[in-house]
Amino acid sequence: MSQKDIEMELKELRNKLNRWSNEYYVLDTPSVEDSVYDKHYQRLLELEQANPDLVTADSPSQRVGGKVLSGFTKVSHDIPMLSLGDVFSKEELIEFLERLENSVEQKLDYSCELKIDGLAISLTYENGKFIKGSTRGNGVIGEDITENLKTIKAIPMELNEPVSIEVRGECYMPKKSFVELNTKREAEGQAVFANPRNAAAGSLRQLDTKITASRNLSTFIYYLMEPEKLGIKTQTEALNKLESWGFKVNNESKQVKTKEEIFAYIDKATDQRANLPYDIDGIVLKAESFAVQSQVGNTVKVPRWAIAYKFPPDEQETKVLDIEWTVGRTGVVTPTAVMEPVTLAGTTVARASLHNPDYLKEKDIRIGDTVKLHKAGDIIPEISEVVLAKRTEDSVEYQIPTECPECGAKLVHLDDEVALRCINPQCPALVKESLTHFASRNAMDIRGLGPRIIEQLYNREMIKDVAGIYSLTFEQLITLDKFKEKSANNLLTAIDNSRNNSIERLIFGLGIRHVGAKVARILAENYKSMDNLAKAKSDEISTIDSLGKIIGDSVEMYFADEHVMELLDELRQAGVNLEFLGKTREEQLESSTDSSFNGLRVVLTGTLDTLKRSEAKSWLEAHGAKVTGSVSKKTDLLIAGHDAGSKLTKAQELNVRVMNEAEFIQQMEEES
């Protein structure tokens, strides 16, 4: 490649990765799988390592990932808690060893340690007494979790010597404790944790320390900061000293001299992994000498003297029984592989998304094929490859459908998309998905009007579009399966309440392409009414901050449809509000800067007893919070009512602060 080509590829990679990172962490709308991001990130690292003079300040490689969540006091790390570089093969590991030894021009001894799958922590002691504990956070700023760490029996409150030190380690939940916790939660009707790491992370960030104490967490301490001040020269010596002071250290650590010893350690760890009482996801290799560690130093993101060898993902073989196609709300037709059930990473898996026709063609997946299945990110089932050696001779290439599986209309590609779409507005699947979206919690929030009820209403020709929801009668609803008087009355009340929503919910509920809840709010703030928005032109919309031409074109095209205008008239006649009722962001900021909720991203979930969900949302927004409908890594606070369900589970898995209704009401009263 020429220098110009390298510069162009680097620029493109940086732009893509920064955009994807923004979609994931800021907008809550990731557009690519983690595996796609990782592939591009690895390519970026390759090019930058070969061309260090082309590394820019805005490169993703110069950032330490992570986010400090609200709810705990922020703590600055005097010495950054850096992440480790990863390798995934012995060949890559050899390259690391050679690079490190060449940099110091000598053969080195190494410390091999198990990579505990938990949460990184830092502990500080003064004169032998524990005074502070914190999370890694973003590597530079973490959170003070001292009180919760005090509940963990493996952490000594006072050391065997009166030393003033900082140590780092991993907090984890033993496998046995994880099984016991999930068994108890399941028996109590609570959501279970996905894995021990998520359980440990969620337990460590509980506001109630009694809950943390009940979770039987443990720790391994693996590093002593500034060891030279104590005359300690090697990692093995430091581990021995840590143990003598009273810390729990992992006794599987081993000092080695050759790559053969390193590989033997990896092989042993791989064989013993399933039988260990705690989860590991690899091994960590460190230069044994602290003098060498100091000599080679760190990059912005990772130490040059250590590396993590990551185990390959758990993988199983299974057989593809069928390929099903489903139609989504926007008409996208998505293939899914139906497979013989297998156990993968502790759960039974029988289905895996095939994403789009291009993915299906690229993998050449056929009905009857034996495939290798793994969980991307240990969460999402994904077919990694077809086992061609087991493909039968009569196997035929799978034919991508040309007609919608629901209505038979011709499928099309729009704007060079890889996705196939059904664009028939009368497609039953599309209509039902649109109705479900319109009634969903983030849109018009019509409780009780879920997919099962919509299926019946549509099939019985009681509704054909969203306006039809507002014509439903008690006599119609009472005829539905398992629908009694109370259910019918509750649904009619929910429908009636939705008439009074501000238009940002309606805009989002209509399902305009490229218009999510955030964009809907921006449009509502700027245009104030549906009538104004319907007249807006793309060029005008495109000038609004954070929107642009794609959204502008989509909105203008949507309202250019005469059927849409007829629908708006029907909604108006049904008494649905078509005006913006909330405060603009500027008005909110003027009145909310002193609120503890100001600037927080908040999610409401479960049933609230004291006030309506819409009232809670309005109050939060008036006090500077941004209320979103889904939990992500960017969520600051989850307010949980009764029967909180999956959002509470996800919040605990992501270490998001959780507040119950009583705590929320108390805070409201203090700030009102």
Swiss-Prot record:
Where would I find the BRCT domain in this sequence?
A: 592-672
- Residues folding into a coiled coil are none
Does the keyword field hold Ribonucleoprotein?
no
Tell me the Gene Ontology biological-process terms attached to this UniProt entry: DNA repair; DNA replication
> Which UniProt key words apply to this protein?
DNA damage, DNA repair, DNA replication, Ligase, Magnesium, Manganese, Metal-binding, NAD, Zinc
- Positions of the catalytic residues: 115
> What top-level branch of life does the organism fall under?
Bacteria
Entry binding sites for NAD(+)? 34-38, 83-84, 113, 136, 170, 286, 310
One GO cellular component this record assigns the protein to is: cytosol
Q: Does the keyword RNA-binding apply?
A: no
At the top of the EC hierarchy, this enzyme's class is ligase
Give cofactor(s), names only.
Mg(2+); Mn(2+)
CDD domains the UniProt entry points to: BRCT_DNA_ligase_like (cd17748), LIGANc (cd00114)
The record's annotation in InterPro entries points to: BRCT_dom, BRCT_dom_sf, DisA/LigA_HHH, DNA_ligase, DNA_ligase_AS, DNA_ligase_CS, DNAligase_adenylation, DNAligase_N
Q: Which Pfam families does the entry mention?
A: BRCT (PF00533), DNA_ligase_aden (PF01653), DNA_ligase_OB (PF03120), DNA_ligase_ZBD (PF03119), HHH_2 (PF12826)
Catalytically driven reaction(s): NAD(+) + (deoxyribonucleotide)n-3'-hydroxyl + 5'-phospho-(deoxyribonucleotide)m = (deoxyribonucleotide)n+m + AMP + beta-nicotinamide D-nucleotide
Residues bound to Zn(2+): 404, 407, 422, 427
> What function is annotated for this protein?
DNA ligase that catalyzes the formation of phosphodiester linkages between 5'-phosphoryl and 3'-hydroxyl groups in double-stranded DNA using NAD as a coenzyme and as the energy source for the reaction. It is essential for DNA replication and repair of damaged DNA.
Q: Which HAMAP family match?
A: DNA_ligase_A
The record's PANTHER family line, in alphabetical order, gives:
CHROMOSOME TRANSMISSION FIDELITY FACTOR 18, DNA LIGASE
Q: Which family does it belong to?
A: Belongs to the NAD-dependent DNA ligase family. LigA subfamily.
Q: What is this protein called?
A: DNA ligase
Species this protein is from: Ligilactobacillus salivarius (strain UCC118) (Lactobacillus salivarius)
